[in-house]
Amino acid sequence: MLFWIIKITSYFYSSTLFEVMNSVLFRGVGGLFFSLFISIVIGNRIIVWLKYKLRMLQTIRIDGPQSHKLKYGTPTMGGIIILISVVTSVIIWSDLSNIYIWYILFIFVMYGILGLVDDFLKIKRGDNLGLTILNKYLWQSIIAWILIVIMFINRVNYVENQSGLEFLRNIVCKLKIWDMILAYFVIVGTSNSVNLSDGLDGLVIVPVILVVSGLAIVTWVVGNIYITSDLYIEHVDCIKELVVVCASIIGAGLGFLWFNSYPSQIFMGDVGSLSLGGVIGLVSILLHQEYLLLIMGGIFVIESLSVIFQVSYFKIFKKRIFKMAPIHHHFELKGYMEPKIVVRFWIVSSILVLLSIVIFILSKY
């Protein structure tokens, strides 16, 4: 919105200032501070609203670590803070004529709604189950496939004089079914991985901020034709606008961390983790950096693998590899204090993000 106001104004009042204000870098910084401001301003109000008016309090697992009983009475659904802050910031600071922005908003909002339903059912039923695994996976898949089909059809160049059969054949050839399947697994897989990682105060939001920061750097590089030509990196047209989205998520994440740091005043809930994970996966697809995400989001991968190995091993051998999965609970049961586990996960995530950026640059030589 602000992009077009500045653009229209610059037609009547030509100025270098307007050019700077309309740059992606300026709007990215603006989006970051704006979403940070919004999240801090609305944070306390939403916490009070969820805790005292709606009574949306986190249910505690009976078989979980004993220390988690102290968390009873803490409100959940804190991802609403992030959702409102990011969507508002993106609408104000980004170029809404860019199709990538709408892809991001679609997956962010739809996965947010799905997470909201899941959180609500957990609280209503008084357990920690919510939607069944099958139902959650089904709706994640439906949302992902709707977006993927739209994305890949938009990549097809329509030729008016083609016959219906020729046009259909052209679409089928250019859709690249394997790319679509990969995109599906990246979106749904990342969404669930971030969701599994959300189990301790501040544990997931900082790795999300770090990974999104890494993706913002990659976005800036692949979106700049001069940098890509110098580094022999694949250039992606119009992708640089996603810097504004990434910056808005970073700002909202920092604002949420203000309330989610130990001891947490509010939990993110599925409304936040599913939507953030979906966006991270989608951005990596749009950047053509799906494999780089495996390193950059290594913390999420480790958390997911710990659950997969635990469940598989138990079904086969009737024994457990870890005391509890995901793996952050294993460390809790081994006697590590929650803040120490969280900070160490942050350190590992920082290293992985830096390593992935180095690999991204050096792999082109």
Curated annotation (Swiss-Prot):
Its cofactor is Mg(2+). Its EC number is 2.7.8.13. It catalyses: UDP-N-acetyl-alpha-D-muramoyl-L-alanyl-gamma-D-glutamyl-meso-2,6-diaminopimeloyl-D-alanyl-D-alanine + di-trans,octa-cis-undecaprenyl phosphate = di-trans,octa-cis-undecaprenyl diphospho-N-acetyl-alpha-D-muramoyl-L-alanyl-D-glutamyl-meso-2,6-diaminopimeloyl-D-alanyl-D-alanine + UMP. It is found in: Cell inner membrane. It holds the Pfam family Glycos_transf_4. It is a multi-pass membrane protein. InterPro entries: Glycosyl_transferase_4, PNAcMuramoyl-5peptid_Trfase, PNAcMuramoyl-5peptid_Trfase_CS. One of its GO terms (biological process) is cell division. The chain crosses the membrane at residues 29-49, 73-93, 97-117, 133-153, 171-191, 202-222, 242-262, 266-286, 291-311, 341-361. Keywords: Cell cycle, Cell division, Cell inner membrane, Cell membrane, Cell shape, Cell wall biogenesis/degradation, Magnesium, Membrane, Metal-binding, Peptidoglycan synthesis, Transferase, Transmembrane, Transmembrane helix. GO terms for cellular component: plasma membrane. Pathway: Cell wall biogenesis; peptidoglycan biosynthesis. GO terms for molecular function: metal ion binding; phospho-N-acetylmuramoyl-pentapeptide-transferase activity; UDP-N-acetylmuramoyl-L-alanyl-D-glutamyl-meso-2,6-diaminopimelyl-D-alanyl-D-alanine:undecaprenyl-phosphate transferase activity. Catalyzes the initial step of the lipid cycle reactions in the biosynthesis of the cell wall peptidoglycan: transfers peptidoglycan precursor phospho-MurNAc-pentapeptide from UDP-MurNAc-pentapeptide onto the lipid carrier undecaprenyl phosphate, yielding undecaprenyl-pyrophosphoryl-MurNAc-pentapeptide, known as lipid I. Belongs to the glycosyltransferase 4 family. MraY subfamily. NCBIfam families: mraY. This is Phospho-N-acetylmuramoyl-pentapeptide-transferase. It comes from Blochmanniella floridana.
